[in-house]
């Protein structure tokens, strides 16, 4: 029996989504272009190509700012669009594993939960994974193993010991 699950890393610049069922990975710019303040004109990389070149009636924005959700409506639109593009035959009930920054508040964490719940992507379960742990797993590091290693990210340095950041 295959598990319908998605791993989502909502970065300020890029969205990364892994679909376990399809063994597919999507990496797109976390941008959206809105025409006349109501119609979606472009998503992801297409919106990025228009950045600073679009006419005045098209607003291009990043729905995330400093790792937290700044525009929930546009972020929901992006999630729905990208997950719909990864699934063949539509989204069925799925588990969602969302990478969240270690240093966010419970209110900010709740915004990530509400984002997935309200995006109409048929979430059965929504679970959070600290970004440092998700990054370690992505680098094929045994995060539960006791070791003396440090990992230097783009802006942060973290130590993972026995699965704790």
Question: How does the language model describe each region?
Answer:
Residues 1-12, 16-28, 33-41, 45-152, ...:
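Nucleotide/phosphate-binding catalytic cleft detector across ATP-hydrolyzing
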Residues 158:
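Conserved phosphate-interacting/catalytic interface
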């Amino acid at each position: 029996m295959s598990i319908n699950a998605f791993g989502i890393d909502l970065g300020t610049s890029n969205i990364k989504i892994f679909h376990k069922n399809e063994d597919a990975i999507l990496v797109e710019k976390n941008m959206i272009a809105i025409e006349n303040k109501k119609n979606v004109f472009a998503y992801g990389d297409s919106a990025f190509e228009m950045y600073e070149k679009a006419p005045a009636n098209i607003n291009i924005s990043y729905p995330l700012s400093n790792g937290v959700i700044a525009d929930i409506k546009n972020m929901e639109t992006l999630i729905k669009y990208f997950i719909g593009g990864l699934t063949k035959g539509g989204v069925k009930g799925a588990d969602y594993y969302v990478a969240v920054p270690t240093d966010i508040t419970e209110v900010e964490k709740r915004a990530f939960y509400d984002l997935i719940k309200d995006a109409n992507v048929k979430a059965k379960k929504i679970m959070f994974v600290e970004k440092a742990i998700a990054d370690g797993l992505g680098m094929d590091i045994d995060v539960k193993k006791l070791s003396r290693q440090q990992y230097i990210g783009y802006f942060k340095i973290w130590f993972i010991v026995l699965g704790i950041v």
